Amino acid sequence: MTAAPLMPDSTHPCRRRKSYTFFWCSLGVYAEALLFLLSHLSDACELPRPFEAMELKGTPKLFYAVGEKIEYKCKKGYLYLSPYLMIATCEPNHTWVPISDAGCIKVQCTMLQDPSFGKVYYIDGSFSWGARAKFTCMEGYYVVGMSVLHCVLKGDDEAYWNGYPPHCEKIYCLPPPKIKNGTHTLTDINVFKYHEAVSYSCDPTPGPDKFSLVGTSMIFCAGHNTWSNSPPECKVVKCPNPVLQNGRLISGAGEIFSYQSTVMFECLQGFYMEGSSMVICSANNSWEPSIPKCLKGPRPTHPTKPPVYNYTGYPSPREGIFSQELDAWIIALIVITSIVGVFILCLIVLRCFEHRKKTNVSAAR
């Protein structure tokens, strides 16, 4: 009995490009190469993460061998602080020792002093470059100058404030504005202190219609040359006689209705009111809100409005639930696809190994 001849190299399953076996074997070879590469790279260190205060000297690499060293330098705007090391070594556990940018400190501006009758606050908690300093004054004083200074970088290792520190001065106000047909108290004072107040009043009128004071009657010095409110006006305000058809006045009746006169209404029996039952005479000679209406019949009940999602532009709750369910299905599909992909890759490698084993056994026979 003669031994079976060995399969020619050109007809080997892994050599026939048109066969499915060649496809499986090729994928297996790629998987082995990937495992080989990962096993060799597992003993290397990756490039360390970027640091805020220091940067790598020279050209960086993707991987470094165990025992290999890298050297750092402080970035622009940072100063080296001895005795911190600027060299790190790749350790067998894939870490760099030591690795810290504590040896590089940020360049600082000079520390600012509190002004008289004021304080300085460092908004960012420091006075290094990029920081801000805010100046405030005690009550009754105001800041003269820039209230906020910025620490800016000059060159590589210097920093300075972008302006001169301000100072605090007492708050004073010039006399308040004069008004037509009226006056204010303390007209003989030329300079008013902080929180000093004046009151306005209207002049008497020669006719039957009196002037009304429209606005705030008292204002005070609230800031440097700043009064707490605008001055009021003195003018004649008359609103028309309030008439409510199918209704009547129950409060505030009179012959003249001047500024801020208030009246109240009610409807006759068999009518209901649409609008506000109380109105006030405003500065523009009209009633606010508008005089109501008395409509015949019983007061209607408020109809129940449809849910907000029934209006155009609002999604319904069903659409929201469907969207959430759809997102969950997409996530589940991605997870299942990933698991199946890993399983297929493992199966490819296993089948390729089994095929090689069978081929070797056949060749040995």
Swiss-Prot record:
Keywords: Cytoplasmic vesicle, Disulfide bond, Fertilization, Glycoprotein, Membrane, Repeat, Secreted, Signal, Sushi, Transmembrane, Transmembrane helix
Keyword Manganese found: no
Extracellular-side positions: 45-329
Covalent S-S links between cysteines: C109-C151, C137-C168, C173-C221, C202-C234, C239-C281, C267-C294
Gene3D superfamilies for this protein: Complement Module, domain 1 (2.10.70.10)
Signal peptide from the UniProt entry: 1-44
Disrupted gene: phenotype observed: Mice have normal testis and fertile sperm.
Protein name in UniProt: Membrane cofactor protein
GO BP of this protein: single fertilization
Domain Sushi as annotated: residue spans: 45-106, 107-170, 171-236, 237-296
Transmembrane regions: 330-350
Function text: May be involved in the fusion of the spermatozoa with the oocyte during fertilization.
Cytoplasmic side: 351-365
